[in-house]
């Protein structure tokens, strides 16, 4: 006899009409709690860097080619051996159940259905194993906030490796949280599970997620790269690189990838837009390791600009959270599909048949 029907782990799912990624924020605000929306949407301090992430794309101009014989552009690519339908990544975000009950499960399924890369935060609301079961072999990376407790770190690395993670993304720019005024005004404390921490401590649910960075090490150094690589046997990608010298130092210390990011403008306010730093960092990397980029991406043209300036994979954060809030995993897929549609149009109109063509596309900027 079949057991009683179990609760659907993906919760309520529905298709969403995506006009553009920017308009998703106002729609998501209507379905999210005030505190949850504030936590997801805000940047640190005055929000300059968060907004500059997007506006800086206006200072990058693509130089289209015509009569190139382009038809039905192919945006598929590979990253660290993983085949992807598009060079997109769900950037690591903490506690996705703030947006939707399915949390990382919905994010993973949406990414899998869209054929893009998924990454999971240390501070996820679902365990690595739970998320991996949904990913079911789809490309996946694990983002690590370096714990103070080395045994806990080993536990996370073991879980990630068993789950089939392609790489470990070590976040280096968030040894503590930026000052976020909406959280203060809303008296907001992050709700829900820190599933990976509870899995290590008790294996049970119910551990609150207050004091998000309490378990994280503040004094990070380059020696961690070889330590993590040696223990895990996985490639280590350093996230939060904003200076060319840091990229060079990380590669020299054994980093297998560089992740250009300012944490969505949620950490140090007053830093440049992430895209402004990408050309110099890409020049310093000089094709030695792959580059991931995130920061303010809201258009398919933004993706092409980042790729042309040196990125190999482009991360999207808040828009996927909003898609998840509005439609569960289907909303995540719909956001990805809309972005892929915009990428396809931009490739056709710039004369790019493949991602290799995009990488060779000429662009003009005011900062490179």
From Swiss-Prot:
Domain FMN hydroxy acid dehydrogenase: 13-368
Amino acids binding pyruvate: 39, 145, 180, 263, 266
PROSITE patterns reported for this sequence: FMN_HYDROXY_ACID_DH_1 (PS00557), FMN_HYDROXY_ACID_DH_2 (PS51349)
Enzyme Commission code(s) on record: 1.1.3.-
Cofactor(s) needed for function: FMN
Gene Ontology MF, one: FMN binding
UniProt keywords, alphabetically: Flavoprotein, FMN, Oxidoreductase
Active site feature: 263
Keyword Mitochondrion annotated: no
CC cofactor note: Binds 1 FMN per subunit.
Pfam families reported in the protein's UniProt record: FMN_dh
Binding site for FMN: 92-94, 121, 143, 171, 239, 261, 294-298, 318
InterPro entries: Aldolase_TIM, Alpha-hydoxy_acid_DH_FMN, FMN-dep_DH, FMN_HAD, FMN_hydac_DH_AS
Sequence similarity: Belongs to the FMN-dependent alpha-hydroxy acid dehydrogenase family.
Function according to Swiss-Prot or TrEMBL: Catalyzes the oxidation of (S)-lactate (L-lactate) to pyruvate, with a reduction of O2 to H2O2. To a lesser extent is also able to use 2-hydroxyoctanoate as substrate. May be involved in the utilization of L-lactate as an energy source for growth.
Annotated protein name in UniProt: L-lactate oxidase
């Amino acid at each position: 006899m079949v057991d009683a029907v179990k609760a659907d782990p993906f919760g309520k799912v529905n298709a969403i009409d995506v006009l553009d990624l920017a308009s998703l924020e106002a729609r998501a605000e209507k379905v999210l709690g005030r505190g949850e929306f504030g936590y997801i949407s805000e940047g640190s301090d005055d929000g300059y860097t968060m907004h500059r992430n997007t506006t800086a794309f206006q200072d990058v101009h693509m130089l289209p080619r015509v009569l190139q014989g382009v038809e039905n552009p192919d945006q598929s690519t590979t990253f660290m051996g993983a085949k992807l339908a598009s060079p997109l990544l769900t950037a690591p975000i903490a506690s996705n159940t703030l947006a939707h009950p399915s949390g990382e499960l919905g994010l993973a399924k949406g990414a899998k259905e869209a054929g893009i890369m998924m990454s999971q935060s240390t501070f996820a609301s679902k365990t690595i194993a739970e998320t991996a079961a949904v990913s079911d072999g789809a490309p996946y990376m694990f983002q690590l906030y370096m714990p103070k407790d080395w045994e806990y770190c080993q536990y996370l690395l073991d879980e990630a490796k068993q789950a089939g993670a392609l790489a470990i993304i070590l976040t280096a720019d968030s040894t503590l949280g930026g000052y976020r005024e909406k959280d203060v005004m809303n008296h907001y404390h992050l709700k829900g599970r820190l599933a990976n921490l509870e899995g290590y401590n008790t294996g049970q649910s119910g551990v609150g997620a207050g004091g998000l960075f309490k378990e994280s090490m503040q004094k990070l150094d380059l020696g961690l790269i070889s330590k993590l690589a040696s223990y895990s046997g996985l490639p280590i990608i350093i996230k939060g690189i904003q200076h060319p010298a840091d990229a060079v130092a990380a590669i020299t210390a054994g980093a297998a990838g560089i992740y250009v990011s300012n944490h969505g403008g949620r950490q140090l306010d007053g830093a440049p837009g992430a895209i402004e730093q990408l050309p110099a960092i890409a020049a310093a990397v000089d094709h030695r390791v792959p580059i991931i980029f995130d920061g303010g991406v809201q258009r398919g043209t933004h993706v092409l600009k980042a790729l042309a300036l040196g990125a190999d994979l482009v991360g999207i954060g808040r828009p996927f959270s909003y898609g998840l809030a509005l439609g569960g995993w289907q909303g995540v897929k719909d956001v990805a599909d809309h972005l892929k549609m915009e990428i396809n149009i931009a490739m056709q109109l710039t004369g790019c048949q493949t991602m290799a063509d995009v990488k060779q596309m000429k662009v003009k900027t005011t900062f490179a």
